[in-house]
Amino acid sequence: MALSPVAIDLDGALGDTRPLWVDFLVDAERRYASIAPLDPSALPKDRGAAAEELDRWAERGVGDWRGALERFAEDRAPVHFRPSADAATALRALAATGRRLGVYTDAPAELAAVALAHLGAGRRVELVEAGAGARERLLAELGPDTAVAASREDLVRISESGREKP
């Protein structure tokens, strides 16, 4: 019998991208102030919804904010992301079993990709869903038997048990 797939919360189980997101918004507010004012505190807390607002903001002359986010994240990843030995061991163990592994986050895809690469998790996961509704999209793709690792503790427990209650 095949083991159930695992959906992993990037921010809860692998590395929290929110502080880097906040730093980017503060930088963007300052950097693009003369082009298009930005008030980070007025953005929705859900980063998928915030990204949609930033897309509209960028149309006022800012340009490719997503590319700017990716460059910003690449420059600052070593400060913000510290690979966890527990998480790395758990991912290795899960990947060795042949389970389908997916990661979800409400962060924009550009930030998620940088975080996964820096945390050493990118090559171990099959699917990555980012932005608004990412968790739901990933669970739909992986199927109803998917175990969810919302925290690092969940990830370790699932890897040690070989199975988890959905």
Task: Describe the residue ranges of each PLM region.
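Short, acidic loop-to-helix structural element flanking the phosphoryl-transfer center
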Residues: 75-103, 113
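Short glycine/serine/threonine/alanine-rich loop segments
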Residues: 34, 99, 144
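Asp-based, Mg2+/Mn2+-dependent phosphohydrolase catalytic module
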Residues: 1-2, 95, 109, 113-166
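Conserved phosphate-coupling serine/threonine residues in phosphotransfer and NTP-handling enzymes
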Residues: 105-107
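Hydrophobic "anchor" residues on beta-strands that sit immediately upstream
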Residues: 5-7, 102, 146-147
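N-terminal helical cap/lid subdomain that shapes the substrate entry/recognition surface
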Residues: 2-85
